[in-house]
Amino acid sequence: MHILLQKYYNYLRIERQLSPYTLINYQRQLEKIVVILQQNDIHSWQQVTPSVVRFVLAQSRKEGLHERSLALRLSALRQFLNYLVVQGELKVNSAVGISAPKQSKYLPKNMDMEQVQQLLTNESKEPIDLRDKAMMELMYSSGLRLSELQSLNLNSINIRSREVRVIGKGNKERILPFGRYASQAIQQWLKVRLLFNPKDEALFVSQLGNRISHRSIQKRMETWGIRQGLNGHLNPHKLRHSFATHMLENSSDLRAVQELLGHSNLSTTQIYTHLDFQHLAQVYDKAHPRAKRKK
C-alpha cells in the first residue's frame, strides 16, 4: 500500500506541483486511512470496495472527525483511487458516488476594523516584533493565505509600486496591491532582517535564519493577539477573512474581492456576502427607528 502511496506523493509534488503544505495535508489524510484499513485486515488497495469506503468514513467519525474533516478525507481518498485507476492499478474508483456527511453552513469569523487597529497598533522596535507586524500588515492589506505569506521571497515584493507577487492554489500567480501601513512595516522589517542571518531569499525568516514555518506564523500571531488584548483566538485565517469582509463592506464589488482572494469560483467568495449582510442588519437594527427590537 505504501509503495503506491509514495508514487502518488511524487506525482503530486512533481507533476501537479502542489505546495509542501497541501502535500502534507494529503499525506496526513491518506496515512490515517491506511491505519484504519490495516487495523481491519485490509492490506491492498484492490480490497477497497464502496462498503470499505463507507466503513472508513464511519470509523473516522467515531474517532471524532467533524463534517468538514470527513469531507476532506473522502476527497483525498477519492482522488488517490482515481490516480490508481488511471495508472491501471484499479479497475474502478470505489469512492465515486459516495457522499460525505452534509456540512453545516460555515461563516468565517472576522475582526471589526477597531479590533484590527488594536491588533496592529504596536510601536515595539524589537526585530522579531517588526517581522511579526510586517507579516500581519501584509496579510491583512492583501488578503493573503498562510501558505502564500510563508512562501514569499525578497523579489516577491515591490516597495515602489506597493505590489506583491504571490503563488496561490494550483500554482496560479497573481499580483496584489498593499497599502501604506504594510509598506512601512515591511521596510522597517527589511532594515533588521539581516540580524537573523538569513540563509536564503525568504522574505520572512525565523530567528535561526531559515524560512519561517507555517506553525511558527500561527503561534506568533496567537501570542501577538493575546499581548494586544484581543478577545478570541487570532490566526491567519481570521486576518484573511477580515480583509474580505471589510473590502465587501466598503466596496460591495464581489468580483474584485474574488480576484484579490484568488478564488477560482465566485461561490467561494459569496460566503462573505452573508457576513456583509449580518453587518448591514446590525446597523439597520441600531439605526432605524422602527427596527429596534424589544429586549
Curated annotation (Swiss-Prot):
GO terms for molecular function: DNA binding; tyrosine-based site-specific recombinase activity. One of its GO terms (cellular component) is cytoplasm. The active site is at R145, K169, H237, R240, H263, Y272 (o-(3'-phospho-dna)-tyrosine intermediate). Gene3D superfamilies: 1.10.150.130, Intergrase catalytic core. The keyword Ribosomal protein does not apply. Belongs to the 'phage' integrase family. XerC subfamily. Residues 106-285 form the Tyr recombinase domain. GO terms for biological process: cell division; chromosome segregation; DNA transposition. It is found in: Cytoplasm. NCBIfam families: PRK00283.1, recomb_XerC. It comes from the Bacteria. It comes from Histophilus somni (strain 2336) (Haemophilus somnus). Transmembrane segments: none annotated. HAMAP family: Recomb_XerC_XerD. Site-specific tyrosine recombinase, which acts by catalyzing the cutting and rejoining of the recombining DNA molecules. The XerC-XerD complex is essential to convert dimers of the bacterial chromosome into monomers to permit their segregation at cell division. It also contributes to the segregational stability of plasmids. Residues 1-85 form the Core-binding (CB) domain. Keywords: Cell cycle, Cell division, Chromosome partition, Cytoplasm, DNA integration, DNA recombination, DNA-binding. This is Tyrosine recombinase XerC.
